[in-house]
Swiss-Prot record:
<dbReference type="GO" id="GO:0006412">
    <property type="term" value="P:translation"/>
</dbReference>
<dbReference type="Pfam" id="PF01165">
    <property type="entry name" value="Ribosomal_S21"/>
</dbReference>
<feature type="compositionally biased region" description="Basic residues">
    <location>
        <begin position="50"/>
        <end position="59"/>
    </location>
</feature>
<dbReference type="GO" id="GO:0003735">
    <property type="term" value="F:structural constituent of ribosome"/>
</dbReference>
<dbReference type="InterPro" id="IPR001911">
    <property type="entry name" value="Ribosomal_bS21"/>
</dbReference>
<dbReference type="GO" id="GO:0005840">
    <property type="term" value="C:ribosome"/>
</dbReference>
<comment type="similarity">
    <text>Belongs to the bacterial ribosomal protein bS21 family.</text>
</comment>
<feature type="compositionally biased region" description="Basic and acidic residues">
    <location>
        <begin position="60"/>
        <end position="71"/>
    </location>
</feature>
<dbReference type="InterPro" id="IPR018278">
    <property type="entry name" value="Ribosomal_bS21_CS"/>
</dbReference>
<keyword id="KW-0689">Ribosomal protein</keyword>
<protein>
    <recommendedName>
        <fullName>Small ribosomal subunit protein bS21</fullName>
    </recommendedName>
</protein>
<dbReference type="InterPro" id="IPR038380">
    <property type="entry name" value="Ribosomal_bS21_sf"/>
</dbReference>
<keyword id="KW-0687">Ribonucleoprotein</keyword>
<dbReference type="GO" id="GO:1990904">
    <property type="term" value="C:ribonucleoprotein complex"/>
</dbReference>
<feature type="region of interest" description="Disordered">
    <location>
        <begin position="50"/>
        <end position="71"/>
    </location>
</feature>
Length: 71
């Protein structure tokens, strides 16, 4: 859990902004969303496999585009 120490004479808004940023970096909100409902292990594997395929396709497309620009 991210913690932020409020500095002396620091406005509340600035401290809140720092806390939100640290929560975002730690992935707290994403973790809460993923644990909001139970997901069957097979559904989780299927989702992760689909994400991997999508990432790979995106990587290949980026590499092909980069190769075209070199000529």
């Amino acid at each position: 859990m991210p913690a932020v120490k409020v500095k002396e004479n620091e406005p509340f808004d600035v401290a809140l902004r720092r806390f939100k940023r640290s929560c975002e970096k730690a992935g707290v909100l994403a973790e809460v969303r993923s644990r909001e409902f139970y997901e069957k292990p097979t559904a989780e594997r299927k989702r992760k496999a689909a994400a991997a395929v999508k990432r790979h396709a995106k990587k290949v497309q980026r590499e092909q585009r980069r190769a075209v620009r070199l000529y």
